[in-house]
Each structure stands twice: as C-alpha cells, then as structure tokens.
Amino acid sequence: MQKTPLEKASIFSQIFFSWTKPILWKGYRQRLELSDIYQIHPGDSADNLSERLEREWDREVATSKKNPKLINALKRCFFWKFLFYGILLYLGEVTKAVQPLLLGRIIASYDRDNEHERSIAYYLAIGLCLLFVVRMLLLHPAIFGLHHIGMQMRIAMFSLIYKKTLKLSSKVLDKISTGQLVSLLSNNLNKFDEGLALAHFVWIAPLQVLLLMGLLWDLLQASAFCGLGFLIILSLFQARLGRMMMKYKDKRAGKINERLVITSQIIENIQSVKAYCWENAMEKIIETIRETELKLTRKAAYVRYFNSSAFFFSGFFVVFLSIVPHLLLDGISLRKIFTTISFSIVLRMAVTRQFPWAVQTWYDSLGVINKIQEFLQKEEYKSLEYNLTTTEVAMENVSASWDEGIGEFFEKAKLEVNGGNISNEDPSAFFSNFSLHVAPVLRNINFKIEKGQLLAIAGSTGAGKTSLLMMIMGELEPSAGKIKHSGRISFSPQVSWIMPGTIKENIVFGVSYDQYRYLSVIKACQLEEDISKFPEKDNTVLGEGGITLSGGQRARISLARAVYKDADLYLLDSPFSYLDLFTEKEIFESCVCKLMANKTRILVTSKVEQLKKADKVLILHEGSCYFYGTFSELEDQRPEFSSHLIGFDHFNAERRNSIITETLRRCSIDSDPSAVRNEVKNKSFKQVADFTEKRKSSIINPRKSSRKFSLMQKSQPQMSGIEEEDMPAEQGERKLSLVPESEQGEASLPRSNFLNTGPTFQGRRRQSVLNLMTRTSISQGSNAFATRNASVRKMSVNSYSNSSFDLDIYNRRLSQDSILEVSEEINEEDLKECFLDDTDSQSPTTTWNTYLRFLTAHKNFIFILVFCLVIFFVEVAASSAWLWIIKRNAPAINMTSNENVSEVSDTLSVIVTHTSFYYVFYIYVGVADSLLALGIFRGLPLVHSLISVSKVLHKKMLHAILHAPMSTFNTMRAGRILNRFSKDTAILDDILPLSIFDLTQLVLIVIGAITVVSLLEPYIFLATVPVIVAFILLRSYFLHTSQQLKQLESKARSPIFAHLITSLKGLWTLRAFGRQPYFETLFHKALNLHTANWFLYLSTLRWFQMTIEMIFVIFFIAVSFISIATSGAGEEKVGIVLTLAMNIMNTLQWAVNASIDVDSLMRSVSRIFRFIDLPVEELINENKNKEEQLSEVLIYENDYVKKTQVWPSGGQMTVKNLSANYIDGGNTVLENISFSLSPGQRVGLLGRTGSGKSTLLSAFLRLLSTQGDIQIDGVSWQTIPLQKWRKAFGVIPQKVFIFSGSIRKNLDPYGKWSDEELLKVTEEVGLKLIIDQFPGQLDFVLLDGGCVLSHGHKQLVCLARSVLSKAKILLLDEPSAHLDPITFQIIRKTLKHAFADCTVILSEHRLEAMLECQRFLVIEDNTVRQYDSIQKLVNEKSFFKQAISHSDRLKLFPLHRRNSSKRKSRPQISALQEETEEEVQDTRL
C-alpha cells in the first residue's frame, strides 16, 4: 500500500480534498488494486483506537461498578471533536436562512420606488454568492469530519467486541447465536459511519426553525404559522406511514426468511437436488413463497412511495397556506412571495427530514450502544488454575452442567413461579416445571492418571466426553468436586480447525520452531505424502477453514498442531474422524503410542483396538462414570460394555422408537418465561390458536432432557446467516454495509428461525456460537477441485528426511538458529491470500445494456415510458404557473399605481384588486390541484412495474441456478450465490424502484426549471449548457474510481467477518494455545485494510460533492449578474430567475447523488444478469409441458427401444473408458475407467480418503464433466435426456438433504404418491413409528434441516426416497459413516428386501459394511481395479489386511474361524462406532 498524500497535504488541499486527485486519475485510467490504496493515518489504526476506548471503558467499569455506561467512555474519547464539527455544521446551516433575506433585498431594489438601491444590487448579488461559498466551506469539512468520527467509533467498538468475544465463557457463547454477534458488528455499528452526520440536527433543526419562523413572522406575521402547522401535520402523517411500512415489513420478514432458508438449503445441497431431479419441484416451492412475499412487498413499496412523494409536493401547500391568509388580510408583494418560497424550502427540509432523521439516528445509536454495553458486561472465561506440584491428572466427585448454576436457577425459578401465581410452598413445582435447567452433563466423575499414561475415554453420543475435556481446559466450570492437573495443555478438537495461513504456520502456531520436532510430527501424523503433492509444500496457503483440504487432511493438521506443542497434558478429542483404516492405525501407533509415549494423554475414542492399548479406560454413559480401570478389568467386569458404549441396549422396536425422545431435545425455547413454564408443565404438543390444519411444525418434548433450554426473547428473522434484526431493505439504504459479500460455508447460510407456512410451535433450534464451534462447515464435495486451485505463496521449501523417533522431540535443547517465532505482524499480501475472495471483477460503471435489459425484462415497459411523459408534462405545468403570475401581475401593478389606492400601506407593488387577485389565486389553486392529482399518483405504475421486473429476474435467476452444471458450483461459493437471492434481490424489491422514481422526478424538475429560466432570460441558457456538460463529464470521471473503491471495500470487508467466524470455530484451540493476541493483531490488520478503503472512498466522495457545488456556485454567480444586468425594472423576473436558480442548484446536486446511487444499485442488477446468463445443463425434453414434467413418474418408457418396454428393467451397467474432471478443461480426476455390472449385483467401492469414490458416483449421475460412455440395459447416456438418466438411479448421499418443509414434501415433492403409499414406505424403512409421534404425521413441518431428526433418521428419509423412486440402480455414498447400529441394521434389512432385484453400488471406508457385496472396485491413482471377493482383495492389498481388526478377519475368513474353534471362546466385542462431526453437531456441549 502507498503512503497517503494527506500527511503532506496543505491546508487548502485538505479543505478541498484535492489530495485525492492522484487516486481519482489513476482509477479513471486503469483498474485499481489493493496495492494502490493509501495507508491509513496512525490515528485511524485499530490498535490505537481500541486501546483508547478500552482504557476509558476500564476506567468507567472501575469508577461505576454497579452500572457502567459505554456512552461515557465514548464521550471521553470523541466528544470535543464531535462538538467542534457540530458547530461548523450549524454555522453552515445558518447561511441557508440568511440567503433568502439577500434575495428579498435584490428583488426590492428593482421596485420603481427603490431605484436609489438599484446600484447596490450587484453588491447584494456578490454577498449572496459569498454566502454559498461560505456554506460550502463549512458544511463539507463538517460532514466529512463527522463521518470520520463515526468511522473511528465503529472501529474502536469493533475491536472491543472482538476482544470480548475471545474472553467470553462457553456458557455465554451457548446463549449467543452467530447471527446475533455478526449482526451486532455489521448492521448495528454501521449506523455510526454515516448516521453521525445527522445526529447534530436534533438541536440544529429546532434552532433553525426558530430562526426561520422569526424571519417569516417579520414578513407575514401570524399567517407564517399556517405553513408550519401544515409541515407538522405532514410529519405526523409520514410517521403514521412509517408505522404502516414497519407493519408490512414485519409480516414480510417471515416470508423472506422462509424463502432464503429453503434457497440456502437447496444451494448447499444442489448435488442432491440434481441427483433426485428435483429442480422443477424446488423452483415451484420457492416461487410460491415468493408470490406471497411480493404481495407484501408491493404494499410496503406503495406506502414508502406516498411517504416520499408527500415531501416533494408539500412545498406548494406550505407556500400557499403561508401566503393566502396574509394576502387576504393585507395584500402581498412579489418580494415577500419569493422570499417566503425560499424560507419554506429550508423550513420544510428542517421539519420533515432533518429533525426526524436526527431523532431516529439517536434512537438507533443509543440502542446499539446499550446492546454493546450489555455485551461487554457478560461473563468471561476463567482458565482453570493448575498445581505445579502435582504430576498427575485427577478428578474427585466432579459434576458439571452447561446450564446455569443452581443458585441462579432457583432465583429465576422463584421469580417465574411468582409471576405465574404458583405457590412458593410447593417445592415439587420447581422440579416439575424446571427440571431442564439443572440436569448436569457430568455427574460424580472420578479418575486419576499418572504422568506419561494414556487415558482412553469412550461412550455413546452425548455421554459427556467432550464436556470432560472442556472442564479440564476451564471452558466448563464444575459445579462440584475438584480437578487437579499440572502444567501446560495442548488440545486437538474433534471438529478440525484450520486458521488462514500456511500449513507450517497452522502446525507451529506461534510456538518456537524446531525443524527436527516439526519433521517428526509431520511424519507421525502421516502428512509427508500429502504435503509433497502441494505445489508449495508446507508453505501452501490455506484458505478459510481449510477449504482447500479434505476432511482427513484437516484432521491430521489439527492433530499435528497439538502434538507439536511441548505440553504436560494432551487432550485429543476424537482426532481420527474421516480417516481411512490404514491411516488411522498408523497415526495411532506412531504418534500417540510412540512419539508421545512420555507424555500424559487423554484420548477420546470408541475403537476397541485403541482401548486395549490405553493404560486406563474411562467409559461414560449418560454423563456418569460407567467404568474406570484397565481394559482387562473392563472385559471381566463389564462384558456387555459394547452395547452401553454405543448407547442402545437392544435393537427392538420399543428402544428404536424411544430415539425420538433424544432427538427432540434439539430445540431451544424461544418465548417468554410463562410460555416456557406452560410448555414444560403441560408436556404436550401445544399449538397456537391460528394454526391451519394442513401444515404442522416443529415440536418440543421436554421430558428427561439433559440439553440446554435457554430463555430468550424473540428475535427478528435472521437474514443471510448473519442478520437477525435488520431487513435487506435497511441494508440497501446504507452506503456502507459490512455484511460480508462472501460468507463462509455453511455457517454463512441463514438458519431457520420460523417458517410462517402453517402451524408452528414457539420453539426453534438456535445456531449458537457454541454449536458453531462443535460442527464443521466445509462441504466435502468440492475438495478435490479446491485443492487444485489452492492459493499459494512462495517461501522456502523444507526438505523432508526420514526422521527416527529414537530421541524425545520435546526434551531437545533448541539452538538459536532453529528458533523461528511466528511474527505478530501480518503482511497485507498474506492477508489477501489467507482470505480467499471470489468477488467479481466488474466494470467500473454500469453498462447501458444492463439498463436496457432491466427495463425490457417486463412487458409493461411501454407503460413506463408513457408515465415518464406524464411526469414531464406535470413538471412543465408547474413551471408554467410562474409565467402566468408574471403576465397577470403587470396589469395589477399598473392598476394600483394609476388609481393610487389608499389602502396600500407601503410603497411596494401589491396585489389588491379583486380581478387580479382572484385570477392569480385561481390559477395557483388550479395548478396545485392538478399537481396533487397527477403528482401523488403518477409514480405508482412505475413502482409497480419495477417490482414486477424484480419478480421476473428472480424467477429467471432461480431457474438458471437450478439448471446450471455442477462445474458452476465447484467454482462458486454458496455464500456468493445466496447474496444474489438476499442482498441483491432486496435491492431490486425495496430500494431500486423508488430510487429510479426519485431520479426521474429530480431530473425533470431541473429540466422544467431550466426551461423557465431560459425562456425568461435566454442568455442564462448559455451558462446552463457548460454546467450540464461539466456535470456529465465529472460524474463519469468520479464513477470510474468510486465504484472501484466500493468493490475494494467490499473485498476488504469479507476478511473481517471471515476472521470472526474462524476465531469462533477455533476459540477453544486459541485459548488452549494462548494465541489470542496473535489473532487480535490479525483482526486489527483486517480492520485497517478495510479502513484504508472506506476512508479513501469517503474522501473522494467529498471531493466530488465539493467540486459539484463549486460548479453550481459559479453557475449561480453567472445567473445572478446576467439577470441583474438585463432585467431593467422588472422585479418579478429577477425574483423568478434567482429563486429557480437556487432551486436548480439544490435539486441538481440532489439529482447527481441520486444518479450515482442508482448506478451503484444497478450493479446488483448486473450481477443478477450474470447469473441468469450461466450455462445450462442439457435441456429437459422441451416437447413436454410443465404440468407433465411436474407429475412425471420416476419410471420411463424407453422411446429408444420399444414402446411396451420399461427402462431400466434389469439394472445392468456397462462403463467404457470413463474419464471425469470437475470443470471443462480441468485436471482429470478419473481416467479411463471400464467395468461392467450384472443386474442385481452388489458392488463395494473402496479406496483411501480422497481417492475419488464419491467422484465416481457423481460421474455416474453426470454431475461432472465426463468423457466415455455408460450404458444401462443397453441404452447409452448419450442417447437419453439428462433427467431421465438420473431418475434411473436411487441415491443415498453422504451429505443428507432435508429441506424446510413437511415430511410429505421431503419424501415426495412432486406430490405423486398417496398417503397410504407414503406411510407404507416409511414403515418399510423404519420411520413409521417416529412419524406417528409428530402432530400431523406426514404434514409435520421439518425446520432447520430436520433438526428434530437424528442423522440416522435423515438417512432413512433418503432411503425412503430411493424406495419410492423404484430405481433399478442404487448408489450409496458412505451410508454408515454417521449411523448408530440400529439405523445401519434397518438400512441393511431394507437393501435386502426393497432392493433385492436392484444393482447396488456401495462406497464405504469400513470393510464390515461390505460383507454382503459380491464384487469390489478399488480406486487407486484415478483408476479402478476389480476384485471378485473380499478375501482376494485383502490378500492382494496388504494395507487393507493390516488395517482390519482381528475380529473383522474372523468374519472375513470363516475357514480360519473354524480352525480356531477349539480355542477358548471369549466374549465377542463388536467394533465401536467412531463419533463423527455430524454427531457432535447433535450434542449439546
């Protein structure tokens, strides 16, 4: 970044912002990059600002312990500068009130009785022009200074909130949703940036009104208050319209949220949507919601339109009501008329715009400050103190809960019970109504391990394994008992966390660098081969969340980070997730057992082979210690431990049915305490009154729940995953929006708060920060492609040598040469690479083609043109009124002069005769009435048509996205796509229609005023032409740079929130490693990068505003002197010319800003058009109409063979020379694969992590760019439509897709099957008993991706879809990866019966799941080898033989089992299910 010229700029350059000219010229000539942006001033750096505010906040907390106020800390930091710029702003506003006085004196000097003052008219004109210059020199620096202070306040509070976030306790994090936190940083704090300039008008506007009313009293006496009274009534009317608009906005919020939730789910699971051929069904569902949303959008738009148009047309009535009473009583002069008009313009702005906006700004700002103040006082994390004298880790009778403390609970309970009129004397009331709060996650835990021992912790999902580790780290505070441990802790989380940076930086993580230790850890964690394949080895830069890595690679890097740190205690929470058998066994042996042999280790695992090698085994069951001791003691004392470990005693229907009790605990109550109490007390599915009978929603079963139910107030719908309080309309109205353009994976997508589609309960699953920390957000589907497109940075490449583990890597003395501290200073180039951004490279300005496509997108374009002409004629009628006044006023002047009317009290020309007065009065009233009739309603068709255009564009974009090839989604993030449906669609719905209307109206007002001025004084037209030309050239010159600066600001905005989300996901790791200062530095760097862009944008914008005003001042000087020099004795002509010139000056400047805003908003339209123009997959058979497509069955008649045959009939599959890549022309991921499958054959697909198993299944469905040929029952995929081909397959994907909607819709979105058929299939797959428990059964609405269902139940839903499809080929992608044994047995049973005649292709890591397969395909090096039996496979592939356990080998080789039958039998121990990331997501930690 370049050094800012502001530091060396002169006072003149700073006042006129001419120091920005170099960047403006550079942006006009070429494309700007981040390197072209100027460095920030040290006073604007996040470090300095946050330090100042933090110091003052700490002082406030120390001095006001009971009730510290954040606003007091802000005052001490920014008050005096804020006051100084407020005074400048007031002085600038005062000049507006003085200008009409000089205008009146100029008009008066042209009266025939004041000819002696004619000579001073030029001096008065010079004074009037000087007032414009003074106003310009006062207002623009004041506005810029206030924007600057607002920016500094936002930065300081940004940093303060981030620092506080890193200190929050886990209990607090469990109560705060990610959306609330991001909304606090984005929507709320943005109000300071530009809103602060309006804050002073809360006192400036009243003073302005007092001054103006005093001056108007001097002119019109009491009649002046008539106009003021009208303005006050108008303000109240606008306030009423504002409340109506908020009502429509609130109603619309639910529909917008519903649409975005389903849209995000579709985008997130687009591969499943295409595999199921659900594109048309999903499009119909979303368009139905969109129709209801647009009805409310139109109502809100009409109200906003009337609110806006009322301001434009109020000017006539203010002048009319002020002048007419005075005219009727005393008569009036033209000087008074024109002076009153000028005063009324200023008065109208102060009363109807400035003061209400200022009040709203203070209301919003104080609300935000109170929110932040409350946030800063929340409970902080307290690290567990350790005893250096002890050498062991021990727990004595430890209990803990993620809920509130017992004391807090009873205080709240008493308050709630008293509020509900329940007797305090009944102690059972507490436990019957509030049992949810006190259920501990851990109870009476006792164990002790000595230094150097390995403790293995096992248990079922939700047993409390991770909570136990959190308690050792201090994240969970024990409610009873004692914990002892010594020294430093290293931690490997179950959800692998990757920070933005190189692979080496992720592993070293700020610890002193030792090459020998580093290489040893790399080898032990099986990372050598993976790193060697990266283009820059371990210096490859990893993006957000490790998006360029596979799940297994992320898990191994996360483990390597923990192992590299020299600690006294290592906490390893299920570190082997998503690892294949061979890799898992090697890492456990070489790393956990050998490399860390002398360290104290606590390993969470459920593998029996690993339990055997542990020194001690601790088995948890429902939060209690089920067993503690050695493994041999476990076999002797608890031979049935395997079933307890898994969490299911029996596989009978009753036990399977009780699973629903567990899965229904995943909602948090979102209502008032009384609702909570009634919900718990009744223990029933209570519905609200206005439910319809067709749709049901989520339920809450609170019985026996050990999960957290938090009492929360209702929040607004969450938008774009990060906004829970503000709607997109509000977002679009701000010039600055810190909502990230590219959100991070799944965490960025909106979570379902509620769906107003029918019955709903007052419950929802809250996406808390703690949930975010215990889940993964990176889709596994695009790993292979993303790896090949990793952003890299060139650094020195380490040589990897074969390191032995003979030496203890932790006890070596490090030489000075080998120590390398990770620097706290982060280079901006590194920052750009760490936070990968896919922002489009758009042209600096919106092209005319975009405008043309936008206006012609709807058939009502001709009506838009007609109404534009109506607008023009109305403006001409308004301007013509002034000419009528002039023409009819001349006879009146002569009449009063000749008749020497005695009633005249002054010497000025006065309208007093009945003829002249009534004539002019009727003309004015007639013109005003026509303006009211034509003006107020003239824009409605325009607004209506533009909203219809938005509807058409949304429909086209949705269709294009759903039918785009998968290669589009492999190169585009889900967050970017969702932004088009949320942010950009909101702009089209809410802001763009009224912005276009305002711009059209302002331009025509200016044209009308210029026309009148030119007719009166033709010489003025000569001065108007160069002004208009200068305006057009200056606008074009500025737009080239400003739009690029906005793009750069948007790019710089994303890393701020990406870093926040990254920090939240890895917060436990950050605390365990003590790297909070490093991440604060990284956050400040991201803030500074954004500040540099935003400050430069504000500076260039202010330069543009000042330059325009300078041009207008020159124009007004020319108009003034031309009119004075050529007017002779006509005061009326001078008055009209100067009044309209002032009006032109204000209106044209407004129009310039409006044109820039419209151009900026049209960029959203341009982005939508680029999505509409996306390439389309092979088109569906166009000969069929839409109804036939929607109702089409999943079995097709083969038009290519015989009409009487059904295709597919057998399921025979032949693959010939199949090659595949993710994008056209990209690297080949599968090459020349050929094999054939017989009908009904079961085939197992094997391979290491990332070998391409899922890729091959995707290639079968034509989801990739493929070459070669596949035939099913003799029909080639090249001769059949794409959707027909896909419907030949039944699919159970690795990533389960449940969209928000009824169970019926999730099973049969096309509505083809009857209830009897659907219930029969659900019973067949084991879902019937669960569905029967839901109110409404098939009509029960699943929210938030089916949060009330376990992952196993979701798999069964997918299985039911496949059964309904009647497909002949079934593809299963890792179906047992996340399943409990019950669900796995159900799937195996269903495969035997429902798919007995089908060809089954099963992709699995575990050999146990493949025992029933007849053939096997092993993927190695992008090719496939076939094996006829698993025995042959194990014999030829030695690493498979090494990876499987002894018990599995007994299953695979029955001959070996018979030969060893004489040996002493031992209790059979089945392999324990490995916990995975998806299961952890379902636990409440």
Curated annotation (Swiss-Prot):
Mode of membrane association: Multi-pass membrane protein
ABC transmembrane type-1 domain mapped to chain residues: 82-366, 880-1163
UniProt enzyme class: isomerase
Start and end residues of each ABC transporter domain: 422-647, 1213-1446
UniProt: ATP 1 binding residues: 402, 435, 459-466, 494
Keyword Transmembrane helix (UniProt): yes
Assigned GO CC terms: apical plasma membrane; chloride channel complex; cytosol; early endosome membrane; endoplasmic reticulum membrane; membrane; plasma membrane; recycling endosome membrane
Short sequence motif PDZ-binding: positions: 1483-1485
Region called Disordered R region, residue ranges: 652-833
Signal peptide start-end: none
EC number of the protein: 5.6.1.6
Location of the protein in the cell: Apical cell membrane; Early endosome membrane; Cell membrane; Recycling endosome membrane
Post-translational modification note: Phosphorylated; cAMP treatment promotes phosphorylation and activates the channel. Dephosphorylation decreases the ATPase activity (in vitro). Phosphorylation at PKA sites activates the channel. Phosphorylation at PKC sites enhances the response to phosphorylation by PKA.
Residues carrying a glycan: 894, 900
Catalytic activity: ATP + H2O + closed Cl(-) channel = ADP + phosphate + open Cl(-) channel; chloride(in) = chloride(out); hydrogencarbonate(in) = hydrogencarbonate(out); ATP + H2O = ADP + phosphate + H(+)
Entry function: Epithelial ion channel that plays an important role in the regulation of epithelial ion and water transport and fluid homeostasis. Mediates the transport of chloride ions across the cell membrane. Possesses an intrinsic ATPase activity and utilizes ATP to gate its channel; the passive flow of anions through the channel is gated by cycles of ATP binding and hydrolysis by the ATP-binding domains. The ion channel is also permeable to HCO(3)(-); selectivity depends on the extracellular chloride concentration.
Domain notes for this protein: Binds and hydrolyzes ATP via the two cytoplasmic ABC transporter nucleotide-binding domains. The two ATP-binding domains interact with each other, forming a head-to-tail dimer. Normal ATPase activity requires interaction between the two domains. The first ABC transporter nucleotide-binding domain has no ATPase activity by itself. The disordered R region mediates channel activation when it is phosphorylated, but not in the absence of phosphorylation.
PANTHER family noted in UniProt: ATP-BINDING CASSETTE SUB-FAMILY C, CYSTIC FIBROSIS TRANSMEMBRANE CONDUCTANCE REGULATOR
Name of the protein in its database record: Cystic fibrosis transmembrane conductance regulator
